[in-house]
Amino acid sequence: MKKLTGLFFFVVFLLIVFFGQAISLYTDWLWFQEVGYTQIFTTTLTFKLTLGLVFGALFFLLIYFNVKLAAHAPRNIRFLEQENAIELPSPELVDPLIQRLLLPVAILLGLFAGPQAASHWQSLLLFFNSVPFGIEDPLFSRDISFYVFRLPALTALYNWLTFSLGLTILATAFTYLLYRGVQYGPRGLFLTDRAKGHLLCLVAVFLLVKAGGYYLDTFELLYSSRGAAFGATYADVYANLP
């Protein structure tokens, strides 16, 4: 009975959250139908839904499986002295709550992360339908179409990945903290081998994504507003460019 009640309130919450979007969507459909451009509406809607489902599912998988892996870490680990340690409930009390809430919370986060990614549908649609301009920029020797069609989509993807990985690292570290895989006591921070390896892998992926972001930032020099003229100046090229 409790499970059915929880499911009912969860569904009601989703209906309240997405009701406004459904009304707006229906209004747009009526307008496009009136002017005879329903094919454009259905094409963009299909692309948005596809993006939302793909990125929402990826976000769900990131959160769910990493937290699940942390929650299933071995429990037979040594405990630090409790004099200055963080006061937390025992893993035996936390485990049933984590197991009960993990799936619905991960689904809910995925439902919010998917539409956020889908809001960049125009950039991604241009990315998949880019055409060359036949003119290269003088600094990086890239076709101008890269800056019009590809760079905005790559920047949006980078921002989504940094947010998703950052939240995953925080959720995973907090789970290890609850299960005593990460502890803080008088002798400093203690991590089990399982927690250390898991978190280091996530941080390594995060840093790789950040490195990709710094690489993308170099192309932003062409939009630099420093100096007397708009674009990459002498200082940008010889001082700021890696």
Per-segment meaning from a language model:
Residues S145:
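Glycine-rich, often proline-containing surface loops adjacent to acidic residues and nearby aromatics
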Residues G36:
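Glycine-centered flexible beta-alpha turn that most often forms the glycine-rich phosphate-binding loop
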Residues M1-L30, Q39-R142, L151, T155-P242:
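Contiguous transmembrane helix-bundle modules in multi-pass membrane proteins
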